[in-house]
């Protein structure tokens, strides 16, 4: 189950991300397995829009809250556009690497440039890498 907490009903980022996640799980039922396995807290802060959300993944499903709530296992900070681009990242074509980004994809190259320049920052790595990869897998529009 993917839920927008009442605290986040007026949060555009929360609604956008929840809509993408719901649509992706509906279009790709195999992602439901990945979603059920997610555990932890993921905070996303779109600095230019001054809006933040916290995803809580537990046995009940996924809930998106307004703001940064609790201590996140992983935090993504950056502009609204690079954060939105995370749903457009291209997966590797090889079956063994299908859950990982394709370094040759134009969106992935743009994301890499944003990471190198500091326009996009990810805190909580390497421990949070499984959460990041699984979240990316569920959110990827393909």
Task: Name these PLM-found stretches.
Residues 1-142:
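Feature captures hydrophobic
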